[in-house]
C-alpha cells in the first residue's frame, strides 16, 4: 500500500504546477488548503456513513477518495507520505501498531 500512496503522491506533485483548467488536481491545489481540508472532511464523513450502512464497496470507494484528497492536502502542505509513515513507525515503537497516540491537552493539532 505504501508504494501505491507514494505513486499517487508523486502523480499529484506532477500536477501541482499544471494549469488548473487542465487538471482537477491542479484546480483543487489552486483552491488552497482550506478547500482541500473541507474535501478531506467530506470524504471522511462519506466513509463513516458507508461504514454505518455496512456498505463494504462504498467504504472501499470512499476510502480511495479520502486517500486521494489527503494526499493532495499533504502535497499542498509539503508533507511527504514518508513523514506520515515515520510517525506511524514512531507510534508503533511507543504504543504498538494498533494503538493511537494519546491526544495532548490544549485542543486539536497542539
Please report, for each region that a protein language model flagged, where it lies by residue.
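Flexible "arm" and connector segments at domain edges
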Residues: 1-63, 67-110
Amino acid at each position: 500500500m505504501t508504494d501505491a500512496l507514494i505513486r499517487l503522491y508523486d502523480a499529484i506533485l506532477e500536477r501541482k504546477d499544471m494549469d488548473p483548467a487542465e487538471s482537477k488536481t491542479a484546480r483543487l491545489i489552486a483552491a488552497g488548503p482550506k478547500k482541500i481540508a473541507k474535501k478531506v472532511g467530506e470524504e471522511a464523513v462519506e466513509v463513516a456513513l458507508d461504514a454505518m450502512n455496512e456498505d463494504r464497496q462504498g467504504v472501499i470507494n470512499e476510502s480511495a477518495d479520502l486517500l486521494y484528497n489527503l494526499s493532495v492536502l499533504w502535497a499542498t502542505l509539503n508533507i511527504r507520505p514518508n513523514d506520515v509513515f515515520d510517525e506511524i513507525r514512531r507510534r508503533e515503537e511507543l504504543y504498538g501498531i494498533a494503538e493511537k497516540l494519546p491526544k495532548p491537552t490544549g485542543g486539536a493539532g497542539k
